[in-house]
């Protein structure tokens, strides 16, 4: 497959360490970042982290803060209104997946740089040049701005709720399926397949898989492993120029459930369930994936997430329609209701 131009979008600098939030002014100086800043953050815990960031900004820095708690197009518009008022040099996204997604999409739409400062290791959007924004045509990722820099403070990340940490593990292990789906599409449809980016995504998944052995014993070391895996996954997407290395049938299932059951479930939790199911379809050892996730307290049954059997089965039957241009193990026609029910029961997602 001949491609005239392939653009790789990567962060310029990645800072990972303990208590590094106190060195933000040094990092900004190294990168030539100057105020005014527009800080995008959440409304609760993440706002407290944002306050600590503000305390450590360069002396006399000018800044404005906007708080959001969802990742909708309306939230993006709210940020853009403040952008017009403040005319910032750069955006700082301080929060979880929703905050960082809104920040990077607003940065993309307004031709601005942004710095990613995650407060939970729940998503690989920390690094990637893609965002998931509700209110667009479909519940899939759209092109956004890659971060100029990432500042990942292990002390902060390891204090995030365990449910969010587990969701990050579920999201990252899913790359095992994404890469297999990508390889399948290359073989059957002649789709472009990047060996290097696929290997990087797969390495991220294996790293997260190893994390399941450590996280219960040493939370900080486990979170460091996880954040490195999440960052690598985001880099793989930036190198591929698409979400292909990190999003396959397991993500299609997650997006389908989100359409049917839009509230109360974390994206990474749904990806984890989808990974178990799609591992079965790919003929790989789904039991070991399920067992590893279960040992860290990950919800491996639909009912643990408040999902009905019907929602799971329905999601499996419509998953292939979420991104029909993206070929996966689900094929063009998807699964019948009876097949979907059988697979969900065999993998113990439903009883």
UniProtKB/Swiss-Prot annotation:
CDD domains cross-referenced by the UniProt entry: Gro1PDH (cd08173)
Catalytic activity: sn-glycerol 1-phosphate + NAD(+) = dihydroxyacetone phosphate + NADH + H(+); sn-glycerol 1-phosphate + NADP(+) = dihydroxyacetone phosphate + NADPH + H(+)
Main location: cytoplasm
PANTHER family from the UniProt entry: GLYCEROL DEHYDROGENASE, GLYCEROL DEHYDROGENASE 1
Assembly mode: Homodimer.
Family: Belongs to the glycerol-1-phosphate dehydrogenase family.
Protein name: Glycerol-1-phosphate dehydrogenase [NAD(P)+]
Originating species: Saccharolobus islandicus (strain Y.G.57.14 / Yellowstone #1) (Sulfolobus islandicus)
Lineage of the species this protein comes from: Archaea, Thermoproteota, Thermoprotei, Sulfolobales, Sulfolobaceae
């Amino acid at each position: 497959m001949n491609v005239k131009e392939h653009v790789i979008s990567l962060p310029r600098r990645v800072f990972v360490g303990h208590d590094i939030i106190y060195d933000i002014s040094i990092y900004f100086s190294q990168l030539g970042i100057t105020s005014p800043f527009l800080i995008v953050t959440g409304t609760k815990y993440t706002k407290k982290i944002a306050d600590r960031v503000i305390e450590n900004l360069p002396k006399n820095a000018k800044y404005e803060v906007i708080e959001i708690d969802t990742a909708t197009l309306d939230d993006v518009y709210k940020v853009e209104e403040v952008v017009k008022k403040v005319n910032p040099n750069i955006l700082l996204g301080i929060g979880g997946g929703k905050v960082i997604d809104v920040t990077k999409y607003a940065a993309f739409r307004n031709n601005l740089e942004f710095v990613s400062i995650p407060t939970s290791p729940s998503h690989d959007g920390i690094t990637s040049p893609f965002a998931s924004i509700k209110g667009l045509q479909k519940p899939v990722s759209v092109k956004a701005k890659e971060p100029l820099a990432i500042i990942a403070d292990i002390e902060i990340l390891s204090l995030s709720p365990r449910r969010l940490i587990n969701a990050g593990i579920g999201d990252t292990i899913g790359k095992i399926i994404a890469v297999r789906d990508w390889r399948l599409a290359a073989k059957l449809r002649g789709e472009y397949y990047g060996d290097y980016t696929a290997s990087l995504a797969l390495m991220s998944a294996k790293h997260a898989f190893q994390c399941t052995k450590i996280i219960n014993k040493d939370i900080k070391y486990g979170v460091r492993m996880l954040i490195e895996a999440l960052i690598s996954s985001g880099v793989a997407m930036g190198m591929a120029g698409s979400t292909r290395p990190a999003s396959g049938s397991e993500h299609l299932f997650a997006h389908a459930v989100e359409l049917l059951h839009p509230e109360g479930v974390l994206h990474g939790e749904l990806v984890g369930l989808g990974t178990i199911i799609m591992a079965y379809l790919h003929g790989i050892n789904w039991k070991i994936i399920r067992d590893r996730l279960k040992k860290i307290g990950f919800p491996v049954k639909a009912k643990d997430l408040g999902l009905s059997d019907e929602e799971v089965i329905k999601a499996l039957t419509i998953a292939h329609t979420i991104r029909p241009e993206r070929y996966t193990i689900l094929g063009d026609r998807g699964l019948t209701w009876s097949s979907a029910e059988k697979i969900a029961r065999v993998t113990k997602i439903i009883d």
